[in-house]
Amino acid sequence: MAVWRPSDSKVYLPPTPVSKVITTDAYVKRTTIFYHAGSSRLLTVGHPYYPISKSGKADIPKVSAFQYRVFRVRLPDPNKFGLPDTNIFNPDQERLVWACVGLEIGRGQPLGVGVSGHPLFNRLDDTESSSIAIQDTAPDSRDNVSVDPKQTQLCIIGCAPAIGEHWTKGTACRSTPTTAGDCPPLELINSPIEDGDMVDTGFGALNFKALQESKSDVPLDIVQSTCKYPDYLKMSADAYGDSMWFYLRREQLFTRHFFNRAGVIGEEIPNDLYIKGSNGRDPPPSSVYVATPSGSMITSEAQLFNKPYWLQRAQGHNNGICWNNQLFVTVVDTTRNTNMTLSATTQSMSTYNSKQIKQYVRHAEEYELQFVFQLCKISLSAEVMAYLHTMNSTLLEDWNIGLSPPVATSLEDKYRYVKSAAITCQKDQPPPEKQDPLSKYKFWEVNLQNSFSADLDQFPLGRKFLMQVGVRTKPPVSSKKRSASTTSTSAPSSKRKRK
């Protein structure tokens, strides 16, 4: 006889509903008005390895091709912009915003390979092609080593700073006893990428100051720095997609040399992995291996810069809308990495003497930013304002939209003579100044508030945009000349008769 039994499997209930994030195309209406904006030539010069301090401050900054360049581009408020058509929107029911539809990052200076290194680099043996290695007995076997680091081209566009990740020293549990010299626990840290932060040069995304106390394991430019790598996973999973609309990336490297580290091996090789040796080979030599990277050949055929890019659909929900009238351009370009060596003599020389010559090194970078922006408008409906307030509460404040305070139900005190010395001072407190939430971070400020132009055909990127959308500029008006009348004085030729 068939008997019905309830299922023994678990029943999974659906998760509680959450507020849905919608794309900006659902509440942003685009117009047919476009503007071009471009920066001037942006230059920076400094020392490629470390800052130089002469009077207690960084008189010569650190400028390296392995630094992030993070441009914070300031845009004018479109609601206070002088528009050609004042009827384009209703200020009582709508607000205007900018949408980035095209950009071009110009790079100057020639292609070049830059070398970085350390005069006291921790290397013991050449493990690629060396003689028989024995146990390290010298207390200091550091050597002068230079490398051409990893080659990187990167560009991240968004209206919020890009997010980076790196490993640093974590906190050990109280139940785990630690002593001096133990391997520290690791912790993955997320932080905004700032202008001047170091990129991954092939030695990992680490806080080298905290994790390598020997100060001899990596080149000079990162030995006391933190190398960050963009956290593409976190930015792609961002609910609103403000930190990364899209990105361009090209990385390449290979290994040039193979070394091992000198020092005491903190974690010995298990005995079952080898057979003991003799003649200074017990215990075995250092098994902490390290490879020096190389960025390989640099060509103009693999350049990401000096060409236009058009934004049709962003990877996230923000389809190029510049909230708070700003956008962030994060750039890395190690293909223009020439470190210029300069020399100056201390006195006039008749014969060459290297002790009378001072050597210097400098690195220079050159940028130019061009954009095409589209004017858009947002309807101030109750649903849209509630959504924007949840996403970013400062937007409504910048648009001079606030909530009216409720009617006071308690009894308030009102003095008759407010300027009398007999009562407490009745002077109103000044409202607190609006604080920039990103003021503690370092960016390269680029002000484009006075650089907007509607004449797109007057700029290189504007002409490329007009060609992209299929709009041709009108030819200049030319005055028509009267054609001179021609009078033939010769007799008309008679037709040849057919025979």
Swiss-Prot record:
Identify the stretch(es) annotated as Disordered.
472-499
Q: Which UniProt keywords apply?
A: Capsid protein, Disulfide bond, Host nucleus, Host-virus interaction, Late protein, T=7 icosahedral capsid protein, Viral attachment to host cell, Viral penetration into host cytoplasm, Virion, Virus endocytosis by host, Virus entry into host cell
Comp. bias (Low complexity)? 484-493
* Main location group: virion
Question: Is Disulfide bond one of the keywords?
Answer: yes
Q: Does the keyword Membrane apply?
A: no
Q: Could you mention a single GO BP entry for this protein?
A: endocytosis involved in viral entry into host cell
- GO terms assigned for molecular function: structural molecule activity
- Coiled coil residues, start to end: none
Q: Where in the cell is it found?
A: Virion; Host nucleus
InterPro entries linked: Capsid_L1_Papillomavir, Capsid_L1_sf_Papillomavir, dsDNA_vir_gr_I_capsid
Mind naming one GO cellular-component term on file for this protein?
T=7 icosahedral viral capsid
What is the documented function of this protein? Forms an icosahedral capsid with a T=7 symmetry and a 50 nm diameter. The capsid is composed of 72 pentamers linked to each other by disulfide bonds and associated with L2 proteins. Binds to heparan sulfate proteoglycans on cell surface of basal layer keratinocytes to provide initial virion attachment. This binding mediates a conformational change in the virus capsid that facilitates efficient infection. The virion enters the host cell via endocytosis. During virus trafficking, L1 protein dissociates from the viral DNA and the genomic DNA is released to the host nucleus.
The family assignment reads: Belongs to the papillomaviridae L1 protein family.
Quaternary data: Self-assembles into homopentamers. The capsid has an icosahedral symmetry and consists of 72 capsomers, with each capsomer being a pentamer of L1. Interacts with the minor capsid protein L2; this interaction is necessary for viral genome encapsidation. Interacts with protein E2; this interaction enhances E2-dependent replication and transcription activation.
Q: Which protein is depicted?
A: Major capsid protein L1
Q: Which organism is it from?
A: Human papillomavirus type 53
Question: Top-down, what is the taxonomic lineage of the species of origin?
Answer: Viruses, Monodnaviria, Shotokuvirae, Cossaviricota, Papovaviricetes
* Gene that produces this protein: L1
